[in-house]
Structures are given as structure tokens and as C-alpha cells.
């Protein structure tokens, strides 16, 4: 699992965020604050998306299901939108509603902290604050693989 993260993330970013993922608090005049310290002790599925991204549209119903089915077990889904034009994100959300927290990052500040290069990119952060899994893109046929990683963390010690 760690090898997958190492191949995707830059070594420095990996080292930093393995230790600090749940302690990150970012805000600016352009971005909404994202204070992951509020989710300490929970599992966070952090998804970066954009309105123009077709796979993002496919992932939203699945993320809604994740939040609905596993929220009571400690899973929190947070989607970070990177559109520069908030109206485009709002249009997307009218067509594809989100039953989870959505944060806007038009400046790319939050995405930059995680070195996000593709849409969608999702990070699975454990109760321990470490990034356990990173995947770029969303392939419906890989949902079982994604879910296996989530289930593993849900079974982990509270």
C-alpha cells in the first residue's frame, strides 16, 4: 500500500503528509478553509474534482453511497473543487448533488499542498492521520478495490 503512495506522491510530500495529513489547516482569501483537525480519529476520503471532469461526475453517486453507508462507522467524504469559476461548480452540483462536504479551492492552494495532478484524485486518510491510499481517476470497475481499502481502515482500531 505504501509503495503505491510512494510511486504517486513525491517523496517529500509523502513524508510530510504521512505525518501531517489530519493536522492540515489551510485557508486563504480565495479558498474555503479546510481544517482536517476536526476529523481526527475518523477516516477521511478526500476527493479533488472539477466541473469539466467526466469521471468526477461518475464518482459522485458512489461517494454519496460511501457517506450514507459508512458515515456512522467513522468515514467522512470531503470533495475539494478546483474550478476557478464557482458558478461552474454550482451548476455541476445542481446536476450531480453531493451528500457530503464540498470545499472550494479556486486558487488551487489545497490541491497544491497535496501535489494533485489529475482529476479526480482521491486520498484515503486513516484515523492515524496517515495517507493510506491515493488513486487518480475514477473507474467504476475498480470500486471494489477502492472499497477494500476503505473497509480495511474501518476495521482498524478506533
Model-derived regions: residue spans:
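N-terminal secretory signal peptides that target proteins for export/translocation
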Residues: 1-10
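Bacterial N-terminal signal peptides
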Residues: 11-25
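Boundary at the C-terminal end of the N-terminal hydrophobic targeting segment
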Residues: 29-33
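Conserved helix-turn-beta segment immediately C-terminal to the redox Cys motif
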Residues: 42-43, 60-80, 94
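Short pre-active-site segment immediately N-terminal to redox-active cysteine/selenocysteine motifs
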Residues: 42-44, 48-52, 118
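Conserved redox-active cysteine motifs that mediate thiol-disulfide chemistry
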Residues: 48-65
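Short, internal strand/loop/helix patches
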Residues: 90-128
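Thiol-/selenol-based redox modules, centered on thioredoxin-like
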Residues: 124-158
